[in-house]
Amino acid sequence: MLSNPKRTRFRKQHRGRMKGISYRGNRICFGRYALQALEPTWITSRQIEAGRRAMTRYARRGGKIWVRIFPDKPVTVRPTETRMGSGKGSPEYWVSVVKPGRILYEMGGVSEIVAREAISIAASKMPIRTQFIIAG
């Protein structure tokens, strides 16, 4: 199920810029294994969901998965073949702003071999370079 905020204060946001490294959400909090971002990017709610599904499918019933990022930034897109001007486009999809060091997914309750494979499948769905890390 794609996630997006139930309600926001404003419909549209500035694009902003991704400077520096992530100081929040860069430590393992819930599970034992995690996937950590190494590059700055926007990760869409579809990509987050694809990674979550891949991990869940590989791990089957065993283990628990935590998604540590949430898409809370609306991205606007203008209709195709529209002339310049006449305001900003309408919100099309949601993204999560990810900086280097940010934990994307965590996993626990499975062996390291299973976790490594499940997380590598999820990593292949991400648009950036990532690394597998172990708590400790």
Swiss-Prot record:
Transport keyword on record: no
PROSITE patterns assigned: RIBOSOMAL_L16_1, RIBOSOMAL_L16_2
Family assignment from sequence similarity: Belongs to the universal ribosomal protein uL16 family.
Xref: Pfam families: Ribosomal_L16
Gene Ontology process terms (BP): mitochondrial translation
Species of origin: Buxus microphylla
Regions crossing the membrane: none
HAMAP family to which the protein is assigned, alphabetical: Ribosomal_uL16
Molecular function in Gene Ontology: rRNA binding; structural constituent of ribosome
Protein's recorded name: Large ribosomal subunit protein uL16c
InterPro entries: Ribosomal_uL16, Ribosomal_uL16_bact-type, Ribosomal_uL16_CS, Ribosomal_uL16_dom, Ribosomal_uL16_sf
Cited CDD domains: Ribosomal_L16_L10e (cd01433)
Coiled coil ranges: none
Claim: Plastid is one of the keywords in the record: yes
Assembly and interaction partners: Part of the 50S ribosomal subunit.
